[in-house]
Amino acid sequence: MSHEKSFLVSGDSYPPPNPGYPVGPQAPMPPYVQPPYPGAPYPQAAFQPSPYGQPGYPHGPGPYPQGGYPQGPYPQGGYPQGPYPQSPFPPNPYGQPPPFQDPGSPQHGNYQEEGPPSYYDNQDFPSVNWDKSIRQAFIRKVFLVLTLQLSVTLSTVAIFTFVGEVKGFVRANVWTYYVSYAIFFISLIVLSCCGDFRRKHPWNLVALSILTISLSYMVGMIASFYNTEAVIMAVGITTAVCFTVVIFSMQTRYDFTSCMGVLLVSVVVLFIFAILCIFIRNRILEIVYASLGALLFTCFLAVDTQLLLGNKQLSLSPEEYVFAALNLYTDIINIFLYILTIIGRAKE
C-alpha cells in the first residue's frame, strides 16, 4: 500500500507532509483577502492609519492611502471641501439654538429690507378720519337746514295765531289751504322719488324751500282754527318731545333702523284709522287716532335721527342732506299737528 492509501486508511487528521518541508506545527496563515479590482489600492488594515502613514505589508507599495478618497488634512468623506454655510441668524454666545426659520419665508436676519414693514403703509386710518369728518359735516349741514325750516314754520304759525287780520283772512279763504297742499304734495313726491334731482344743487334747495313754505302755510292755517293757548302748549310739548327723542337716539344702543318694516305697516294701519275717523265723528276716537299718530311719528323721528348719525345698521349717504332734513322736518311737523289735535279735542 502506498503512502497516500495508508493515510486514508489510518484516518489521521493531518495530511502527509510534503517532501522538502519540516514536519511540525506551522505558523498561522494570514486571512485571505480578496484582491482589489485592477488599478485600485490595497485594502486598509484593521486599525486606523495615522496621518503620517503606516508601513504596508511586504508586498504592498509603501504607506496605504485612503481608499477612494483624496488625501488632505481631515478629509470629508465623499463631500467636497469648502467653507460651511453661515446661519441666517448671528451666533448666540450662550449656546441657545437659533429660532426656527421657514425655508419659504424671506430672510430677515441680515436686515436687508428697504423701508418699514407693510402695515406702516396702511391707508385705512386716514380714510376713517376722513369719513368721520364727512359725517360730522353732513350732520351739521342737516341740522342747519332743519333749523331754518323750523324757523320759517314757527314764524308762520306765530303770525297766523297772533295777528287777527291774517287769522281772519285764512279762515275766510279755505281754498288757499288746498292750493298749498297740492304744492306740498308735488314737491314731496319729487324730493322723495327723484334721487338725482334731490342731489342736484341748487335745485334741491329750491324744491325744499317750496315744500317748506307750502307746509308752513298749511300748519299756520290749521293753527289759526285753534285758540292761542293750545297752539303755544303744542309748540312747547313738541319741542320737549323732539329734543328728548333726538338725544335718546344718539345715546341708545338699540337700533331703531331695524324696525323700519314695522313702522311702514303701522303707517298703513294709521291711514285706515284716519279714513274711519272721517266717517265716524267721535271726539274720543279722534284723540286715540291723534295719540297713535304722535307715537308713530315719534318713532319715525328716532329712526331718521339714527339714519342721520350713521352708527347703526342703516344710514344715509352724506350726499342726501336734503332728504335727511326733509325726513326730520316732516316728522316734527306731524308730531306738532297730532299733539295740537289732542290738546284741541281735549279742551272741547
Curated annotation (Swiss-Prot):
GO terms for biological process: apoptotic signaling pathway; endoplasmic reticulum calcium ion homeostasis; negative regulation of endoplasmic reticulum stress-induced intrinsic apoptotic signaling pathway; negative regulation of extrinsic apoptotic signaling pathway via death domain receptors; negative regulation of neuron apoptotic process. The chain crosses the membrane at residues 142-162, 174-194, 205-225, 230-250, 260-280, 284-304, 323-343. The keyword Transmembrane applies. Residues 1-118 are annotated as: Disordered. Its main location: membrane. Signal peptide: none annotated. InterPro entries: Bax_inhibitor_1-related. GO terms for cellular component: endoplasmic reticulum; Golgi apparatus; Golgi membrane; membrane. It is found in: Membrane. Residues 14-41, 82-101 have a biased composition (Pro residues). Keywords: Membrane, Transmembrane, Transmembrane helix. It is a multi-pass membrane protein. Residues 42-57 have a biased composition (Low complexity). One of its GO terms (molecular function) is monoatomic cation channel activity. The keyword Membrane applies. Belongs to the BI1 family. LFG subfamily. Potential apoptotic regulator. This is Protein lifeguard 1. The lineage of its organism: Eukaryota, Metazoa, Chordata, Craniata, Vertebrata. The gene is Grina.
